[in-house]
UniProtKB/Swiss-Prot annotation:
Keyword Metal-binding found: yes
Cofactor or coenzyme needed: [4Fe-4S] cluster
Domain of life: Eukaryota
Posttranslational mods: Ubiquitinated and degraded by the proteasome in presence of high level of iron and oxygen.
Cofactor note: Binds 1 [4Fe-4S] cluster per subunit. [4Fe-4S]-binding affects RNA-binding activity, thereby inhibiting activity of the protein.
InterPro entries in the cross-refs: AcnA_IRP_Swivel, Acnase/IPM_dHydase_lsu_aba_1/3, Acoase/IPM_deHydtase_lsu_aba, Aconitase/3IPM_dehydase_swvl, Aconitase/IRP2, Aconitase_4Fe-4S_BS, Aconitase_4Fe-4S_dom, AconitaseA/IPMdHydase_ssu_swvl
Family label: Belongs to the aconitase/IPM isomerase family.
Protein's recorded name: Iron-responsive element-binding protein 2
Source organism: Xenopus tropicalis (Western clawed frog)
Its job: RNA-binding protein that binds to iron-responsive elements (IRES), which are stem-loop structures found in the 5'-UTR of ferritin, and delta aminolevulinic acid synthase mRNAs, and in the 3'-UTR of transferrin receptor mRNA. Binding to the IRE element in ferritin results in the repression of its mRNA translation. Binding of the protein to the transferrin receptor mRNA inhibits the degradation of this otherwise rapidly degraded mRNA.
Keyword match Transmembrane helix: no
Lineage of the species this protein comes from: Eukaryota, Metazoa, Chordata, Craniata, Vertebrata
Record's subcellular location: Cytoplasm
Length: 957
């Protein structure tokens, strides 16, 4: 603390005797009060981590002056924690293990090397679907009994049967559908779905496909998983969430998020850097979450801040009351649509206004998770009373929540309506009252219709010419009524009659309120005396057993069943509309009357395959509207003014009479859904699973590298490590490895996905006695530098001007031969010839990818000369000790008359500074100047040390 210039801001937290914090609100009160909440979180991190070297005092004052300095001032940011998915976690932890080896060779204690902040690694990306054929059984007795290593599954809330017991349903269990066709992630279906009898909430034997895929997952990835387990034993600040537990964003939101962190009595706001694209979801909880690449996350783990350009912050004011018929999905999609149209790309969006309190945490996190849809970096909901209530419901003890509230009030991070609102770069307004429910159809999902306009639109479709929407029904036939007998009762069918109504939750699992709304609507409908006509084929496909648990625990499942919405199975409901044909009498009546019969579905937007041949119009609607239209029996209805039906007493029942209020839905969600969801996940993580628990892992401080391993290998990043960094050496007679054009992406540099059979990486694996089906993917082998280096620039779409055609080839200048990039680089390194890359504009576009910088370094590349860089990749090059040089404005290799077959010599001065001009000489006599594209002194320091890894390692020597 004594080295921190802001130490004077530290004070005890009111009401506690053992907790202190930086009261950043006292730094400059007036300026602080005008800051957006998300910027206040950044300021607190800078103040708390200020060391005068990587984080400077001036950085804090630049943030206080945010509105004037945003978009051009860069500030360092250290998160409270780091979250890794397994593909990015492997190389990061391999580097930490290698660093321990390196400092131990200098006689230092390797136990010193640990992540500087809490680091959570979630192993959710390793599963591949080797088997997709599920057991579809008429009863459980036909499913093989599982005797060994059953993974943990959620239990039914009701009475359970033994593993070998038979479900004695008269109708039989229809089982799960094809996993390969499931909507959403198939991996999530396997990892998160308890295997329950869909009719009776009884545990059943696991589907054969899931069991085999999980078994193969552990066998195929055993080395990686053993390494992860060693990490949990060897390193402080590292926790691993094993496979079969949940996806990164689910675990981050439901288990890892703290809102307020505490370390040795010191408290501060939670914030996270995550390598999963869904990291931004936690911004809905008031936790600043940023999605980053592997090198940025690794830097933060090493205690090195990432660089943020102070962003514009768009204030999104939510006003008005939510339309009673609008579901959470309507609200979420409408807000994201507004943001997309407003153009918020690259900004932080912060929500305020009296409408914010109407959004549940599930709504907020869904909006925050959809950042990629509208291009924002962050969609931030400051902590408020809704957030604090959510924490209590998810198992955080009352005393802790009280402490959080006291702290957040002290540093003015608790959003309240009666305080001064922050200043924003720009303010958008969204009136929640303007959000109305929509349905889509009748032929295309992109044709959206307000529910209020549904009757008018359907009648217009009857008149329109046959085409994208029209059916061209003659006016005299539009009022036709066709009598039909079904189950000894008489009915009449007309245009718009509903004959299929299917509720699915494939796309609604992340926000259960819409399914609860449907269930509560069904309950009220039954209590009001309404029924669904028996000829309408109704069905319910929950998407996962978790949704069934919600519906059962809240007591609404029997009411859905009473209306005919019986559960037909889990996963993808392909069978909806196709399992059994419509009753013959109904089909005959539709055909004879040439009726435009309708199906109403929720969930799947690709609904063409769900249609029966006699159903001309298909509409997509939210689950509660599916129930409503089923009750009405027609889509040709104005739900605002026309009754759904009559009860036994002849009283008309309108939708407004039975539609559950938002408050009712939220109460059920908060009392039933959220507590069960979080307690189940917590139990699952604490118990872990049998396979993980039985997995052997070393107990040593240093990792015992297996030289035969093709997954885990000690990287050579520290092989030349010295206590004192050597002075910058001149680069003499360097050859060009690659001469590239504009917009070269990180995928060109380090391709993801499968390993081609003819690639250098494949040849290496074959030499290790692997056959092609054992190659796995580049992602799975990120812990093996030999594979990843051979995969560098191995993209088939790479265009190298030295070769003149696409492919992972280059021209080896000394021999005059065209060969694989890796083979050429290997020859150059044997000859001790330094290498450079020449490129055009926007070098390093695309996803942040650590091996796009690590790979070139291991190929022997010491310099890249480009017209311009994608900033993140340029930072990665610096982080690996590769000098990013930039042609002067208006110049490039072509204008300078370079062929890239010359030899290049240049020297970076010992007193190198950011943007230093450097002279480059060629063996042909040509000279030109470039700019050293270092943006700050920290980058120069990292480069002089040979990269961030060496910089941090020397701190331990």
């Amino acid at each position: 603390m004594t080295e921190n210039p802001f130490h004077y801001l530290v004070e005890p937290l009111s009401g506690t005797s053992d907790k202190t914090f930086f009261n950043v609100s006292k730094l400059k009160a007036t300026e602080y009060d005008s800051l957006p909440y998300c910027i206040r979180v950044v300021l607190e991190a800078v103040v708390r981590n200020c060391d005068g070297v990587l984080v400077k005092e001036q950085d804090a004052f630049n943030i206080l002056n945010w509105k004037a300095t945003c978009e051009f001032k860069e500030i360092p940011f250290l998160p409270a924690r780091v979250m890794l998915q397994d593909f990015t976690g492997i190389p990061a932890m391999v580097d930490f293990a290698a660093m321990r080896d390196a400092i131990s060779k200098f006689g230092r204690d390797p136990k010193q090397v640990n992540p500087a902040c809490p680091t959570d690694l979630i192993a959710d990306h390793s599963l591949q679907l080797d088997f997709t054929k599920c057991i579809v059984a008429q009863n459980v007795s036909s499913v093989p009994t599982v005797e060994t290593h059953k993974p943990t599954t959620k239990q039914s809330p009701g009475k359970t049967l033994g593993r070998k017991a038979q479900c004695r349903s008269q109708s039989g269990c229809k089982g799960a559908c094809e996993l390969g066709a499931a909507h959403g992630s198939s991996r999530e279906q396997i990892e998160n779905t308890p295997m329950l009898c869909p009719f009776h909430l009884q545990p059943i034997a696991e589907p054969e496909a899931a069991l085999k895929s999980l078994e193969i997952e552990f066998n195929r990835n055993k080395e990686r998983l053993q390494f992860f387990k060693w990490c949990t034993k060897a390193f402080h600040n590292v926790a691993v969430i094993p496979p079969e537990t949940g996806t990164v964003h689910q675990v981050n939101l439901e288990f890892l998020s703290r809102v307020v962190m505490e370390e040795k009595g010191f408290i501060y706001p939670d914030s996270v850097l995550g390598t999963d694209s869904h990291t931004t979801m936690v911004n809905g909880l008031g936790i600043l979450g940023l999605g980053v690449g592997g090198i940025e996350s690794e830097a933060a783990m090493l205690g090195v801040p990432i660089t943020l350009t102070l962003p514009e912050v768009i204030g999104c004011e939510l006003t008005g009351a939510i339309n009673p018929l609008a579901t959470s999905i309507d609200v979420v999609l409408s807000i994201t649509k507004h943001l997309k149209q407003a153009g918020v790309a690259g900004t932080f969006v912060e929500f305020f206004g009296n409408g914010v309190s109407q959004l549940s945490v599930a709504d907020r996190t869904t909006i925050a998770n959809m950042c990629p849809e509208y291009g924002a970096t962050v969609a931030f909901f400051p902590v408020d009373s809704v957030t604090l209530r959510h924490l209590k419901q998810t198992g955080v003890d009352v005393q802790s929540v009280s402490t959080f509230e006291t702290y957040l009030q002290a540093v003015k991070l608790l959003r309240q309506e009666n305080v001064q609102q922050p200043e924003y770069s720009k303010v958008l307004q969204i009136n929640l009252n303007s959000i109305v429910p929509y349905v889509s159809g009748p032929k295309r999902p992109q044709d959206r219709i307000s529910v209020m306009d549904m009757k008018k639109d359907f009648e217009a479709c009857l008149n329109e010419k046959t085409g994208l929407k029209g059916f061209q029904i003659p006016e005299k036939k539009q009022s036709i009524m066709v009598p039909v007998t079904y189950e000894n009762s008489e009915y009449s069918l007309s245009h718009g009659c509903v004959v299929i109504a299917a509720v699915t939750s494939c796309t609604n699992n992340c926000n259960p309120s819409v399914m609860l709304t449907a269930g509560l609507l069904a309950k009220k409908a039954v209590e009001a005396g309404l029924t669904v006509k028996p000829y309408i084929k109704t069905s319910l496909s929950p998407g996962s057993g978790t949704v069934t648990y919600y519906l059962s625990a809240s007591g609404v499942l029997p009411y859905l069943s009473k209306l005919g919405f019986d559960i037909i199975g889990y996963g993808c409901a392909r069978c909806v509309g196709n399992t059994n044909p419509l009753p013959e009498s109904i089909v005959t009546a539709i055909k004879e009357g040439e009726l435009v019969a309708c199906g109403v579905f929720s969930g799947n937007k690709h609904f063409e395959g769900n249609r029966c041949s006699c159903v001309c119009a298909n509409y997509l609607a939210s689950p509660p509207l599916v129930v409503a239209y089923a009750l009405a029996g027609t889509v040709n209805i104005d739900l605002q003014t026309e009754a759904l039906g009559e009860n036994a007493q002849g009283e008309k029942i309108f939708l407004r009479d039975i539609w559950p209020s938002r408050e009712e839905v939220l109460e059920v969600e908060e009392t039933m859904v959220i507590p069960s969801m979080f307690s189940e996940l917590k139990l699952k993580i604490e118990k872990q699973n049998t396979r993980w628990n039985l997995l052997d892992a070393p107990e040593s401080t240093l990792f015992p590298w297996d030289l035969r391993s093709t997954f885990i290998r000690s990287p050579p990043f520290f092989h030349k490590l010295e206590k004192i960094p050597p002075p910058i050496q001149p680069i003499e007679k360097a050859h060009v490895l690659l001469y590239l054009g504009d917009s070269v992406t990180t995928d060109h540099m380090s391709p993801a996905g499968s390993i081609p059979r003819t690639s250098p990486a494949a040849k290496y694996l074959i030499q290790k006695n692997l056959i092609p089906r054992e190659f796995n993917s580049y992602g799975a082998r990120r812990g093996n530098d030999a594979v990843m280096t051979r995969g560098t620039f191995a993209n088939m779409k790479l265009f190298n001007k030295l070769v003149g055609k696409t492919g992972p080839k280059t021209f080896h200048l000394p021999s005059g031969q065209i060969m694989d990039v890796f083979d050429a680089a290997e020859l150059y390194q044997k000859a001790e010839i330094p290498l450079i890359i020449i490129a055009g504009k926007k070098y390093g576009l695309g996803n942040s990818r650590d091996w796009a910088a690590k790979g070139p370094f291991l190929l022997g590349v010491r310099v890249v000369i480009a017209e311009s860089y994608e900033k993140i990749h340029k930072d990665h090059l610096v982080g690996m000790g590769i000098a990013p040089l930039q042609f002067l404005s208006g110049e490039n290799a072509e204008t300078l008359g370079l062929s890239a077959k010359e030899q290049y010599s240049f020297s970076l001065p010992v007193d190198l500074t950011p943007r230093h001009k450097i002279e480059v000489k060629t063996n042909t006599g040509k000279t030109f100047h470039v700019i050293a594209a270092f943006d700050n002194e920290a980058e120069v320091t990292f480069y002089k040390h040979g990269g961030i890894l060496s910089y941090v390692a020397r701190k331990y020597l």
